[in-house]
Amino acid sequence: MKAAIVVFPGTNRERDMVHALKLVTGQAPRLIWHGETSLGDLDLVVLPGGFSFGDYLRSGAVAAHSPIMRDVKAFAGKGGHVLGVCNGFQILTESHLLPGALLRNAGLRFLSQDCHLKVENASSPYTQGWTRGDVFRAPLAHGDGNYTASPETLKRLEGEGRVAFRYCGADGAVSDDDRTTNPNGSTRSIAGILSENGRVCGLMPHPENLTDPEIGATDGVPLFKGLVEALVG
């Protein structure tokens, strides 16, 4: 699988993503600087976590206008696969590759903790490694992770099965108003969503940080293994 990770000033999770992808593919992905204008021949583009351009204006707002994002948009427009994690999810919404927005966390403070996610759609390349209803653990680290969208957009996301992950308790229970299960206050506990064709995915927690048993756990491995199976077979 030919993958590349886009690096912006302030990105800090690209090496974690390299490690996760290398574990499941056997080869390191390319790193592409934001100032470049061409992605080249790829199967997957990843926008990793961090604080691109210091989160000035809004998280992801400046990065969305970087030169490389023109080709990322073109790649997605042709049916290419794009994964955005944390700041990458914010960049995807700012680029209008995914609907909605990520607001300041409900508690108005930065969160760095583990959370549990419930798989809502197991038929996309990003979720096919799980079964619908599965619950897994993932770390989160963000100040602007509170997902919101218009009522019409939310209805469309739910109706089209485009909610990929929801925040939940360890038992899978979802409670929008419970900050122990929905820590940032996201609308309908939404943690990750898909594009209309299912090929663009954004989520706030970091599955790449739980892919190696030597550094904690392997809860995030199904996402990456599912991608390899979907894109390479």
Swiss-Prot record:
Keywords, ordered alphabetically: ATP-binding, Cytoplasm, Glutamine amidotransferase, Hydrolase, Ligase, Nucleotide-binding, Purine biosynthesis
Catalytic activity: N(2)-formyl-N(1)-(5-phospho-beta-D-ribosyl)glycinamide + L-glutamine + ATP + H2O = 2-formamido-N(1)-(5-O-phospho-beta-D-ribosyl)acetamidine + L-glutamate + ADP + phosphate + H(+); L-glutamine + H2O = L-glutamate + NH4(+)
Domain Glutamine amidotransferase type-1, chain residue ranges per copy: 3-233
MF (Gene Ontology): ATP binding; glutaminase activity; phosphoribosylformylglycinamidine synthase activity
Positions of the catalytic residues: 86 (nucleophile), 206, 208
Enzyme Commission (EC) number: 6.3.5.3, 3.5.1.2
InterPro entries, alphabetized: Class_I_gatase-like, PRibForGlyAmidine_synth_PurQ
GO cellular component, one term: cytoplasm
Localization annotation: Cytoplasm
Pathway: Purine metabolism; IMP biosynthesis via de novo pathway; 5-amino-1-(5-phospho-D-ribosyl)imidazole from N(2)-formyl-N(1)-(5-phospho-D-ribosyl)glycinamide: step 1/2
CDD domains registered for this protein in UniProt: GATase1_FGAR_AT
Gene Ontology BP annotations: 'de novo' IMP biosynthetic process
Function of the protein: Part of the phosphoribosylformylglycinamidine synthase complex involved in the purines biosynthetic pathway. Catalyzes the ATP-dependent conversion of formylglycinamide ribonucleotide (FGAR) and glutamine to yield formylglycinamidine ribonucleotide (FGAM) and glutamate. The FGAM synthase complex is composed of three subunits. PurQ produces an ammonia molecule by converting glutamine to glutamate. PurL transfers the ammonia molecule to FGAR to form FGAM in an ATP-dependent manner.
Subunit note: Part of the FGAM synthase complex composed of 1 PurL, 1 PurQ and 2 PurS subunits.
Record-given protein name: Phosphoribosylformylglycinamidine synthase subunit PurQ
UniProt organism field: Gluconobacter oxydans (strain 621H) (Gluconobacter suboxydans)
Gene of this entry: purQ
